[in-house]
Amino acid sequence: MATEAAPPRIAVRLPSTSVRDAGANYRIARYVAVVAGLLGAVLAIATPLLPVNQTTAQLNWPQNGTFASVEAPLIGYVATDLNITVPCQAAAGLAGSQNTGKTVLLSTVPKQAPKAVDRGLLLQRANDDLVLVVRNVPLVTAPLSQVLGPTCQRLTFTAHADRVAAEFVGLVQGPNAEHPGAPLRGERSGYDFRPQIVGVFTDLAGPAPPGLSFSASVDTRYSSSPTPLKMAAMILGVALTGAALVALHILDTADGMRHRRFLPARWWSIGGLDTLVIAVLVWWHFVGANTSDDGYILTMARVSEHAGYMANYYRWFGTPEAPFGWYYDLLALWAHVSTASIWMRLPTLAMALTCWWVISREVIPRLGHAVKTSRAAAWTAAGMFLAVWLPLDNGLRPEPIIALGILLTWCSVERAVATSRLLPVAIACIIGALTLFSGPTGIASIGALLVAIGPLRTILHRRSRRFGVLPLVAPILAAATVTAIPIFRDQTFAGEIQANLLKRAVGPSLKWFDEHIRYERLFMASPDGSIARRFAVLALVLALAVSVAMSLRKGRIPGTAAGPSRRIIGITIISFLAMMFTPTKWTHHFGVFAGLAGSLGALAAVAVTGAAMRSRRNRTVFAAVVVFVLALSFASVNGWWYVSNFGVPWSNSFPKWRWSLTTALLELTVLVLLLAAWFHFVANGDGRRTARPTRFRARLAGIVQSPLAIATWLLVLFEVVSLTQAMISQYPAWSVGRSNLQALAGKTCGLAEDVLVELDPNAGMLAPVTAPLADALGAGLSEAFTPNGIPADVTADPVMERPGDRSFLNDDGLITGSEPGTEGGTTAAPGINGSRARLPYNLDPARTPVLGSWRAGVQVPAMLRSGWYRLPTNEQRDRAPLLVVTAAGRFDSREVRLQWATDEQAAAGHHGGSMEFADVGAAPAWRNLRAPLSAIPSTATQVRLVADDQDLAPQHWIALTPPRIPRVRTLQNVVGAADPVFLDWLVGLAFPCQRPFGHQYGVDETPKWRILPDRFGAEANSPVMDHNGGGPLGITELLMRATTVASYLKDDWFRDWGALQRLTPYYPDAQPADLNLGTVTRSGLWSPAPLRRG
């Protein structure tokens, strides 16, 4: 049999490629990487220094040639410079007996304002002199007779940051002066004496004389936009950075390895645990509590569009948020669609889902086979992630994007290590830099960048032998600096430096060694130290401690990848250290650890499994520590911020169900420790079983044997059930959950639709049955109750500084709780029953009698039984289901009662029943006592008041006005969406339809209303916004008088929801000033003057 010969083998000689030839093949990429990378970095670094177009604004007065007051509240409080010229003859309008009521020729603040002399400039008549007062300093004074004489020409005044000076031109100092015969002038220096400007006000009228001039240069250094040169440089810088990264990618491909898929296999599949996490996050998006700063951030975002830059609206004299404002700019764009809470927080929900996707698809598989295959690790990771995210990240603060940024930075570093390529390192630098500048707490992301140094050095060392160092480093340098372009796109280097120096000087600016304050707050029984927040942090610390201990003891956690797990641990430790350098110390900053908490939870779950920790004793001790963490966490309140707290069980007390939960958990801790001791002394085996369990039982046992997973999911269940129960128990009254669910149906105005406002309390007064209106209040019995039995000052008791709350304080360390108009006082004319007490809420003294039990000197027992007042019909009661009595004093609820009767019972002098009032408000100030009409039988036709004051302490007294049934309208109907409103920063998210007053070109819009949170919230946030901090309160208190309007929360009548104040200008006829605008080009180093610091 013939065989076929095999074909001869032909050896093919392939061309060899040397390192030098390979470098030549990538020469273009190398050149592009070097040139584009270096130029991109240079342009990014130069961006803050490049010129901008600044809009200038000049406030000139008189306007329209007349003596007419104008409003121009400067957001920076002071002008960069101020020049005033007043002809001497202009003072003639202040002279003579016919002008006794006219005292101010010109001022920068209304003379009626409480702090007018302390803060502003007033050119006024004092007795027979004309005095120029600047910030409580009489700068120059001249007799009015000399001012109106022939020698006096004009008064000039100039103000700059370093000095202020004034002179009466033509007048000289008198013979008794220090320098007789010298020009009559005054000067102050060594301090910033520039006066605060909220407008130009005068008591004079008519045409303005020639030569009268007021010219203030408004500080508009932040009202700027990029010049064409800067815009071109920024565009070119981004393009060159992109080109450098493309070149770096080409150099990366020189290793000959095929491209690895970017997304993990089956990344789109959803399992049972994924479904549970998604369901919890979505439900929490609707019913969950928000963070305290959501209103702060939302208002900044809403106002920024009209303002032209992202100013810190509530503090620091309107300086910009940059370099931390880019995330808020995205929220400002998002707010164009809707300002409803569920819409504004939609990006936060997307970040939460992305965080879990990254943890479950990227982090857990990279931590090693033991973590990847452990169900306990997955459940613990999910529980830890949710335990941190739910209480800390369900709002508009930047912590969610920082938590996500830290995870993405770590993933990019790990991809760089796995592929030995540099492009992921460059991407990590971009993500890390954006995370770093998302907010002050972005400093926690520095750990994710630091852990990239080691892998970067290794890869650079390997690649530099082929391509050199510069082609590899230049693109990374460009990537690390490109974030300067969006940060400084419309601002200058000098402006940002001055803004940050101002914030540090004004404060709060706590030092690194003040970090203990954050943990003090964590262990306070307040929303800052609530059960949920305390457990989140303690569980994170426990997971970190276990992971570190096992890594140190065994070199690595058995079954885990050493490099990635060490880097996760390192990032967390560095992040905790970096948090020490944040200028404020609040517990919501811990939200940046949400992603790391899930990752560490997975590591800790593996670290305490039987495979890694074989000792049953040690595993039991760990379980005892977890139970102790639960006990320590439940030694607090289940409290949340502001409206999120409505209806929440145990919101003001430690949880208790038949017995104290914290005590029960502590006892359980002792029992588990006794079990650990038994394992140590008696059953000291490792506890491993030889029988092979079923797959289901193995999974169940793995989860049950992970106490951290059980604890975290119990807390998650507790939080979700608490807030869901709050929504159910509050219904039909307002709650966060109800409001968010209704927003799906188009009802997006939040609390404004449920707050009922009583504009005219006089209209709802009940009519006396028999006695005259003036006498009815004391017609039954009046012993020691008199029309003037009320102290002149009934200001609410101040609240002392609470431990740990040292970030914001006023000058005396006290925060008073009185609402404007409720602090009492006296009137010149007596009221209907002879009382001179000043009444709150626009009550008319001519129609409202008042009786009180207080007297000067020794107190005596007092009793009051009013006459009968006619109740409305049952149909009318349904339309206004509340009875109100305005009262003042300090008394127990049982000491003031409401009695009802039928006509027959009243005629016989008997009552058919009685009830106590709900006392909502701050004692001893005026407040509205409430009683639901539903508690009064439908057969009752008359009511009367009964008060009994047997306490003889001087501070214990009662003052009452007649009962009334309020006629109310919703706050949305009263305030509307058009009026400018001063929204306190706690309420911004709850009132999304109200328009916050804006600012533009350095001048604030004048608000007509102010909405405050509940008393405790108002006391906490008002110091943030005051004059010392450069906030809007320092403007409104000079420009307007605030009056509290009576208001109630629908179907939740006894709730202190907050307050509505009407803001009335001291000069009602003053119009907004017209500014003279212009545009100039400024360099990045230009500064007009120092920023005002107080």
UniProtKB/Swiss-Prot annotation:
One GO BP annotation of this record: cell wall organization
Keyword set, alphabetical order: Cell membrane, Cell wall biogenesis/degradation, Glycosyltransferase, Membrane, Transferase, Transmembrane, Transmembrane helix
Compositional bias of kind Low complexity: 817-831
The protein's Enzyme Commission number: 2.4.2.-
GO molecular function, one term: arabinosyltransferase activity
Membrane-protein topology: Multi-pass membrane protein
Region (Disordered): 817-836
Protein name, UniProt field: Probable arabinosyltransferase C
